[in-house]
Amino acid sequence: ANMIANNFVTEKVDMIYAIATSTAQAAAQSTDKIPVVFSAITDPEAAGILKKNVTGISDRVNVKQQLELLLKLDSKIKKIGVIYNSSEQNSKVQVDDLKKAASELGITIVEKSVTQVSEIPQASETLVKESDALYLPTDNLVASVVNLITEKAIKAKKIAFGAESAHVKGGALITQGVDYYEMGKEAGKIAIDILKNGKNPSEITFKKM
């Protein structure tokens, strides 16, 4: 990512569009002058990318609203399992948000952190046994095998709640979260403001979907 970002700077591009935390960090570190528009970052501030030439769209969701919707489906839910990649900053932020929201609603979070796909089957098996429902965060590792996780939830007759619309396509029962296609369109509008309308990124506060 750093090499690509530096190449863009060398080529003197008009703008850099960065998707996800690591690529946005590389872009932000590579230049103070070229506008950088990001998307699919949960916590831009913690990622250290908020500079005068950087703006974009965050995918951080209202987890408490999500849990409230889940409880409307089944008010008996007391334990929610979550599996996530502990090496992914976005995922750790989401799990922290999940714990905070759960404590406010009297729910216990059962978490399993993984760092590679091969760990997910066993972690999923454990979670469906120890929890009443599963919460799927917007996590790249989880997304790569979401069908595997939801199949185990369905087999155990447990609800799988997705934090993004793609999770439902992967077998989750319900979602109230991010549509990354729409996020891309919103990022495109910011790009137009900068490239066509002459706005400075510092004039455009980053926003959430």
Task: List PLM regions with ranges.
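Short hydrophobic alpha-helices and adjacent helix-cap/hinge residues
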Residues: 1-209
